[in-house]
UniProtKB/Swiss-Prot annotation:
Phylogenetic lineage: Bacteria, Pseudomonadati, Pseudomonadota, Alphaproteobacteria, Sphingomonadales
Keyword flag Membrane: no
UniProt record similarity statement: Belongs to the HMBS family.
Residues the record lists as S-(dipyrrolylmethanemethyl)cysteine modifications: 251
UniProt-recorded name of the protein: Porphobilinogen deaminase
Cofactor(s) named in the record: dipyrromethane
Pathway stated in the Swiss-Prot or TrEMBL entry: Porphyrin-containing compound metabolism; protoporphyrin-IX biosynthesis; coproporphyrinogen-III from 5-aminolevulinate: step 2/4
Any one GO CC term of the record: cytoplasm
An MF annotation (GO) of this entry: hydroxymethylbilane synthase activity
Further facts: The porphobilinogen subunits are added to the dipyrromethane group.
Functional description taken from the UniProt entry: Tetrapolymerization of the monopyrrole PBG into the hydroxymethylbilane pre-uroporphyrinogen in several discrete steps.
Keyword Transferase: yes
PANTHER family: PORPHOBILINOGEN DEAMINASE (PTHR11557:SF0)
Length: 315
């Protein structure tokens, strides 16, 4: 047993303070308890408010990008005030500081999006939304995908945690929005929204995946986390994130990437990159055998992309 994970010296699990982040931290704690036979008192959940949770009236790209979700947790982990940090991997920068180590990923939940509409609108699919409807999102990927499918729709900024976005929707700030199915499920909102197929809305890289980081020099905690790592999820998500690294995109880049294990045991990676207005897009897929295959896909997508897309990626 890790000497940290005792009632007298509990393993401190850092997390954002939002309801979804707290639910995910409790999932990580439950996995550690089950894997190591720990007492509940051997773990301590340490919530903190991320900068991204405080700023909700502007797009991420205007105020610092994905680092807004990790800055406080990174500082606490580096300072030793927490031992591990639990993240929604979709919100974590592609290139991480070498001081931190991604020690585990929990088994991935449903990676798809759900379409949620306000009262008075009957739509199960994006194609069924009324002409000119306002679809709220802060995601460049979702905005570009929606604009490609329905150029008539008005995409408007809608930020905040799940409850905040649902409240804004109910208040009429938008007619519809797209939310991650995994987040809704983890919050117990099983009946909210209609799932959208990946053939229409390919997910964001890492969507539905929970990652747990520790300090790279903390061998004991690395060993503790290894027992709860879901290897198939880790390999699939690593492929998606490797593609992002090749593309050089940031939080302003409309990119979708999803690696899925096939019935014959191979891992297929699908990816799409878009112009901001969704009018231009390039798609491709590979069977993942090694890092070189993923890199080749990224380079091919960029080579085939028109200037309207390439300018959104740091090549």
């Amino acid at each position: 047993m890790n000497e940290l994970a005792t009632p007298d010296n509990p393993l401190r699990i850092g997390t954002r303070a939002s309801p979804l982040a707290m639910a995910q931290a409790h999932m990580a704690a439950a996995a550690l308890i089950a894997a190591h036979g720990l007492a509940m008192a051997a773990l301590e959940i340490v919530p903190m408010t991320a900068t991204g949770d405080r700023i909700q009236d502007r797009a991420l790209a205007e105020v610092g990008g994905k680092a807004l979700w990790t800055r406080e947790l990174d500082a606490a982990l580096d300072a030793g005030t927490i031992d591990v940090a639990v993240h929604s991997l979709k919100d974590v920068e592609t290139l991480r500081d070498a001081r931190f180590f991604l020690g585990a990923m929990l088994e991935r939940a449903d990676p798809r999006d759900r379409l949620v509409v306000r009262e008075g609108i009957a739509a199960q699919k994006i194609s069924e939304l009324p002409h000119g409807a306002r679809l709220g999102t802060s995601s460049p990927r979702r905005a570009a995908q929606v604009r490609r499918l329905r150029p008539d729709l008005d995409t408007v900024l809608l930020r905040g945690n799940v409850a905040t976005r649902l409240a804004k929707l109910a208040a009429g700030e938008a007619d519809a929005t797209l939310l991650a199915a995994a987040g809704l499920e983890r919050l117990g909102m099983h009946d909210i929204g209609a799932v959208q197929g990946t053939e229409l809305l390919l997910p964001a890289a890492s969507q539905g995946a929970i990652g747990i980081e520790c300090r790279a020099d903390d061998a004991a905690t690395i060993a503790l986390l290894a027992a709860i790592d879901h290897a198939p999820t880790h390999r699939a998500v690593a492929a998606e994130r490797a593609l992002l690294a090749v593309l050089g995109g940031d939080c302003r880049s409309p990119v979708a990437a999803y690696a899925e294990w096939q019935a014959d045991g191979v891992l297929r990676l699908d990816a799409e990159i878009f112009s901001e207005d969704g009018a231009d897009h390039v798609a491709g897929h590979v069977i993942v055998t090694d890092a070189g295959v993923v890199a080749a896909l990224g380079h091919r997508l960029l080579a085939e992309a028109p200037p309207s897309i390439r300018r959104l990626f740091a090549t």
